[in-house]
Swiss-Prot record:
GO terms for cellular component: extracellular region. Residues 1-19 form the signal peptide. Keywords: Antibiotic, Antimicrobial, Immunity, Innate immunity, Secreted, Signal. This is Abaecin. It comes from the Eukaryota. The keyword Signal applies. It comes from Apis mellifera.
Amino acid sequence: MKVVIFIFALLATICAAFAYVPLPNVPQPGRRPFPTFPGQGPFNPKIKWPQGY
């Protein structure tokens, strides 16, 4: 009987893991997302080539 309960609990855990849907990450109003590409925002300046070439 313990084996049957263990298998049932294992299957229930697997089904719960597949059924889990994470909540969408909604940015808070008034806050801009952190820039990720060069040239966007004050913390991520554009990459400049050296002036000697």
